[in-house]
């Protein structure tokens, strides 16, 4: 069983270590659309055995990322996730548990962010993956990802 999670993805533009929230916006230069995939049965087994989750979330083709990038401000318009042209989820930055600046600041405390690092912002929902489905992710009115599940 595989589940998909749509994301707004941030690209870092500079080296960042212990960046305060008020300066975090300076560390992001672009946003992209992403979808991550998780093998739920493998994840459940790893959790049950107290093992790492790597195999459940880090397999071949476990993530899709748009090639096109938009300016940082584009994320304020939010993202739309569609399956077979039906809107399944709208991701609004303002509805997230933590602000983007808080996420970037906190991550920079845990690890050094490097130029070009990608930050997949949390996804509110998961969707069961079915062969033959078409996925689209748009930020604002621009479709950045459009692919079929095979």
PLM feature segments, named:
Residues 1-114, 118, 125-150:
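Catalytic-core "active-site belt" of small-molecule-metabolizing enzymes
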